[in-house]
Each structure stands twice: as C-alpha cells, then as structure tokens.
Regions:
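A residue-level detector for the "anchor" residue at the start of short, highly conserved motifs
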Residues: 1-171
Length: 171
C-alpha cells in the first residue's frame, strides 16, 4: 500500500509499498533521511539547510524539488527521475552529478548512467497508476508483483524477450 507523509519542514511525499523512510528528530537544521524502497518527494526549499537522502549506498542532495527515488535493497540499484528543480547525486565523495528536470539517473554496480526520461511514467504510481512504455516483461512482472503484493511467473522464458506498453489503474 502507498502512504502519504509530511515532514516538519514542509516536505511532502508518498511512500510506495515495501518502502521505509527514517530520520532523526528534531528535523529542522539537519534535513537527512534514509530511504529503502521507493518514494516520490516534493522537498521544501531551504537553501541554508539542504535536504539529504541516503539510499542504496548513495547520497542525494536536494535544495527544493520534486522527484521519484527508487532504492529497493533487493534490486541492487538506485534510480532517480527528476520532475522539477535540481538534485546532486553522489556515490562517493569525489563523484558528484547534477541532474536537471526530465532526467533519469541509474546507479548500479558502481556505474552511473544518465538519460532523458518522461517523469510521468515514473511518478504515475503516486496517482494509483502503473505506466509501462516498451518495458521488458521481467520489469513489468517485478513492478506488478510489488504493486499488488502477488507473485508473477512468466510461463515461458520466450516472454522475457518481449516488451509491454500499457497502463494499469488502481481503483
């Protein structure tokens, strides 16, 4: 199930199923959170107190923006899709990457890949929709499993070669 939340600094967000967000109190000067799983965040702007997220062995520094962040431990990667504003991603002290709106960053096995993305596809779950745009069937199965808390089995290995385009709406 999805859970909406508000933090004392004005930041709002939605946690996806199977996700956990934690932070220390008081949450004012040090705006640091830890995330396991997936969250859509609308971070309140405060230039004097940057918002920092630790997820999947990386740090995401935010000044005020909205974006989707996915870092499920079992999936072994971090994915950020920026809707508006800017974020700074780092996996180590010497590697810092700035992101702009409509960019997608994936951090996996020590490698960072950045590409152009449609934020609507990655943020649709917040409105109760799963959107697929030519996604591999293994990815479709994984997201449906998490969304509905069920096990999906592709009956034939040949299906993994195909992609899927469509939208599931949760009424």
């Amino acid at each position: 199930s999805r859970v909406s939340f508000s933090l004392s600094d004005g930041t709002t967000g939605v946690l996806n199923s199977g996700s956990r967000l934690s932070y220390s109190l008081p949450f004012s000067n040090e705006r640091n959170i830890d995330l396991e799983g997936e969250a859509w965040l609308n971070v309140a702007k405060d230039e004097e107190h940057p918002f920092e997220i630790r997820a999947g062995g990386s740090r995401i520094r935010v000044l005020g923006t909205s974006f989707n962040l996915s870092a499920y431990p079992a999936e072994n990667y971090v994915e950020i899709v920026l809707q508006e504003g800017s974020v700074e991603f780092s996996s180590s002290e010497d590697q810092k990457i700035m992101m702009e709106p409509s960019e997608r960053l994936v951090f996996q096995d020590g490698e960072v890949k950045k590409s152009i993305a449609d934020p609507e596809k990655y943020n649709a779950w917040v409105q109760g929709r799963l959107v697929f745009r030519e996604d591999p069937m293994a990815e479709v199965a994984r997201r449906i499993e998490r969304w509905y808390n069920i096990k999906v089995v592709l009956a034939d290995k040949e299906l993994e070669k195909y992609s899927f385009r469509g939208t599931f709406v949760d009424d």
